[in-house]
Swiss-Prot record:
Residue list for modification Phosphoserine: 12
Location of N-acetylalanine modifications: 2
Keywords from the UniProt entry: Acetylation, Endoplasmic reticulum, ER-Golgi transport, Golgi apparatus, Membrane, Phosphoprotein, Protein transport, Transmembrane, Transmembrane helix, Transport
Principal subcellular localisation of the protein: endoplasmic reticulum
Protein name: Protein YIF1A
Cell location: Endoplasmic reticulum membrane; Golgi apparatus membrane; Endoplasmic reticulum-Golgi intermediate compartment membrane
InterPro entries: Yif1_fam
Residues on Cytoplasmic side: 2-138, 196-203, 250-271
GO biological process per UniProt: endoplasmic reticulum to Golgi vesicle-mediated transport; protein transport
Lumenal side: 160-174, 227-229
Function: Possible role in transport between endoplasmic reticulum and Golgi.
Residue stretches spanning the membrane: 139-159, 175-195, 204-226, 230-249, 272-292
């Protein structure tokens, strides 16, 4: 009996194994795919094969090596030209700021009328960095203010349903072009007036870039309170920036050696400083009026 029961169990196992699979409900149309569970293609294997084939291609390897060498050579050339035309140590001076300096400088730009001493402080014939001297110009605030202005302009255009990448790019490029033109005009004016001072291109770029702070406040006030608030903020920030520019550039632009010079030259240098200050409200208005409606 045990023999027959065992034989029956063994035979049932063979019959279970030999039982045909039920016919599929649908015909297999995935002729181009490999036989994976569920009928999905072997994407991992195909990608691995493609990558291995690409890496094994001699032409691809040559192209990758050539592109890498060009990128490395271009990077070296950029660093070389940057060190040639721009002193990195001098550039670091204009970014030597801290949180306390940024807060105080922003307050000085908005309300400069109570500030008394406007002379740049020196230590061993070298100017102190901005974080140690509130009167020292910096490029950190102008850079961050420019980025904030571009973002705020995009938000203002989006609120007015006028946003597009082209319009935002035009706003950013126009703001940069105006600052560059202003710096070039100041350099030309200083050259024609034969002014000997410690002002460099970085100094002029910093003083010209401080207008972005007033532009941000004007646009933000206009978005919150309408056109009336915009014009009030524009008048306040423009007058504050004009006062700041005149007091900051007066000693540096006139130069200590020009005090005993001819009177016409002193007047020309003074007119140059006043002209640079008077030009600020026009630029602020031109770059912000279309953002507030």
């Amino acid at each position: 009996m045990a023999y027959h029961s065992g034989y029956g169990a063994h035979g049932s196992k063979h019959r279970a194994r030999a039982a045909p699979d039920p016919p599929p409900l649908f015909d297999d149309t995935s002729g181009g795919y490999s036989s994976q569970p569920g009928g999905y293609p072997a994407t991992g294997a195909d990608v691995a094969f493609s990558v291995n084939h690409l890496l094994g291609d001699p032409m691809a390897n040559v192209a990758m090596a050539y592109g890498s060498s060009i990128a490395s050579h271009g990077k070296d050339m950029v660093h070389k030209e940057l060190h040639r035309f721009v002193s990195v140590s001098k550039l670091k001076y204009f970014f030597a700021v801290d949180t306390a300096y940024v807060a105080k400088k922003l307050g000085l730009l908005v309300f400069p009328y109570t500030h008394q001493n406007w002379e740049v402080q020196y230590s061993r014939d070298a100017p102190l960095p901005p974080r140690q001297d509130l009167n020292a110009p910096d490029l950190y605030i102008p850079t961050m203010a420019f980025i904030t202005y571009v973002l705020l302009a995009g938000m203002a255009l989006g609120i007015q349903k006028r946003f597009s990448p082209e319009v935002l790019g035009l706003c950013a490029s126009t703001a940069l072009v105006w600052v560059v033109m202003e710096v070039l005009a100041l350099l030309l004016g200083l050259y024609l007036a034969t002014v000997r001072s410690d002002l460099s291109t970085f100094h002029l770029l910093a003083y010209s870039g401080y207008k972005y702070v007033g532009m941000i406040l004007s646009v933000l006030t206009g978005l919150l309170f309408g056109s009336d608030g915009y014009y009030v903020a524009l008048a306040w920030t423009s007058s504050a920036l004009m006062y700041f520019i005149v007091r900051s550039l007066r000693t540096a632009a006139l130069g200590p050696d020009s005090m005993g010079g001819p009177v016409p030259r002193q007047r020309l240098q003074l007119y140059l400083t006043l002209g640079a200050a008077a030009f600020q409200p026009l630029i602020i208005y031109w770059l912000t009026f279309h953002l507030v409606r």
